[in-house]
């Protein structure tokens, strides 16, 4: 692309990046104007030269998020989905069969004054799946800035705005945090918000908060999170030879083993559930079992403090058996 003069290197403040040339923008706009005009025309953020490090990093994280969505087969371009964040949206213009779909934060904020109170949200956008709505964040290789009240307002706004459209009643709102690698999950688990409490920490803004890396492993997990029928199939397989949940065990769990110990399905890497499971085991002095993907085990062993036995799901076998990928 550099040899064809479609991109050029931009190096400033010890940060290297790439920018589209004028020829590249013109080519994209001529090939698919409906797809790219919102990114490459006017005063949109992606069409202006940004020199501030924070803005350049934010744009890089957006691109990283789009690449993860692309590899997971999730539509995000404006020309392949209905415009639902507008004042003239039509009921029935989006159906459950068309999900999953991703809407960027900028698309949501086009509603205008209705979104004033969520303009400072750190989200990249929302991922509408058949069973719930995920608010997507990208922490990159550092702990994300966080404003609890803003994210709570975003949660409430989405429940209200998407009620009955296309979900029955208020949709369940969950969150997904992406990051450079699995090691970032440990930093998020252990974050206390920093000196001024302005950084991310696990709080009550979302009852369920998943983590996945911006890697091929994370892309597989993302595919799983937006296909509840595959998750149900995997759950049934994992629980088939285990005991049922026990009301006598006063902590979060999905099943029990032959000795009556609680078992948690943690392959979806819900940081909130994992944290509650670990805390419960410590409080009640119990041991437990945790089932997750093989690539998730090292960071969990590093973080968890309770007596826990790990059972791993082979990611390669899962891809072949459930996603029919090599």
Identify the function of each model-found stretch:
Residues 137-326:
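C-terminal regulatory/effector modules of DNA-binding transcriptional regulators
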Residues 12, 50-57:
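Conserved aromatic-histidine-acidic binding/catalytic patches
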Residues 38-52:
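A short, surface-exposed helix-loop junction/capping segment
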Residues 4-42:
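Accessory beta->alpha helical hairpin/"wing" motif in late/C-terminal subdomains of nucleic-acid enzymes
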Residues 56-198:
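Mid-protein regulatory/catalytic core that forms ligand/cofactor-binding pockets
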Residues 8-9, 74-80, 233-243:
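Short secondary-structure junctions
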């Amino acid at each position: 692309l550099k040899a064809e003069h479609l991109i050029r290197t931009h190096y400033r403040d010890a940060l290297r990046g790439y920018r589209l040339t004028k020829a590249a923008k013109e080519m994209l706009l001529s090939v698919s104007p409906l797809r790219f005009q919102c990114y490459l025309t006017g005063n949109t953020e992606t069409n202006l030269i940004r020199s501030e490090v924070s803005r350049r990093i934010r744009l890089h994280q957006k691109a990283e998020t789009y690449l993860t969505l692309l590899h997971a087969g999730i539509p995000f371009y404006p020309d392949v989905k209905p415009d639902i964040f507008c004042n003239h949206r039509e009921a029935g213009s989006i159906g459950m069969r068309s999900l999953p779909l991703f809407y960027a934060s900028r698309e949501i904020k086009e509603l205008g004054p209705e979104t004033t109170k969520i303009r400072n949200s750190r989200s990249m956008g929302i991922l509408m799946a058949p069973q719930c709505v995920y608010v997507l964040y990208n922490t990159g290789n550092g702990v994300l800035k966080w404003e609890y009240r803003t994210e709570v307002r975003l949660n409430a706004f989405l429940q209200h705005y998407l009620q009955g459209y296309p979900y029955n009643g208020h949709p369940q709102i969950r969150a997904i945090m992406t990051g450079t690698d699995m090691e970032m999950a440990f930093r998020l688990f252990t974050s206390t918000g920093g000196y001024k409490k302005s950084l991310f920490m696990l709080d009550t803004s979302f009852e369920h908060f998943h983590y996945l890396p911006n890697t091929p492993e994370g892309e597989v997990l993302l595919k799983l999170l937006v296909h509840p029928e595959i998750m149900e199939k995997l759950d049934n397989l994992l629980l088939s030879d285990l005991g049922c949940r026990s009301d006598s065990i006063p902590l979060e769990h999905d099943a029990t083993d032959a000795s009556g110990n609680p078992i948690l399905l943690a392959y979806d890497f819900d940081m909130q559930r994992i944290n509650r499971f670990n805390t419960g085991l410590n409080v009640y002095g119990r041991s437990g079992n945790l089932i997750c993907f093989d690539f998730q085990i090292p960071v969990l062993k590093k973080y968890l403090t309770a007596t826990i036995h790990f059972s791993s799901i082979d990611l390669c076998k899962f891809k072949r058996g459930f996603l029919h990928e090599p």
